[in-house]
């Protein structure tokens, strides 16, 4: 049997998740849905648009986490709102997004696409959080192989880096691709990518990092235990 590529797994899990959540009546007409960012979230946005187009879903209100997702929603005809809009009222019924790493306890790392702040705002204000990923995303411990993104104020980079190093992290300023200089987030900030020499407690470290002056947000997501769907190379989708 041919093994699915990473891209094929992402498409599979995105479509499976949307269709399964509709069947389970966890996604239905009239919902306020947060939509994530990145190569796994985009197929989910597309599948949601297809289920709107075929009449399965109506009156879906989307809140997005990046310019990328806003552009996709515009292309697919999904109305986009802000959490501040009266129609949304600061709370979402459900949010769906990919992840960079998923631990057995369902804590995750997000922010590989530099949208972690907006992703956390949206997903921490959703009643239900859904995470989708390919087989490479399931790991035993977070942040020892894939770096943890930490969004920082540019003028605080050196003191923030020193503070994180005292906690056991090794920091690298994320550089732009096809752009000279560092990555600039949609919020005008910079990203430190942090690798941990030893496994850390994500919940405790999420709090510690955000206590450092100059840190805007970090990519540990531990507040909600999400519904998790992970695709496998042999074409199955499993729930964690």
Q: What are these model-predicted stretches?
A:
Residues 40-50:
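N-terminal active-site wall of soluble small-molecule enzyme domains
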Residues 2-12, 23, 68-240:
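Conserved phosphate- and dinucleotide-binding cores of soluble alpha/beta proteins
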Residues 18, 22, 52:
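Metal-centered catalytic cores of metalloenzymes
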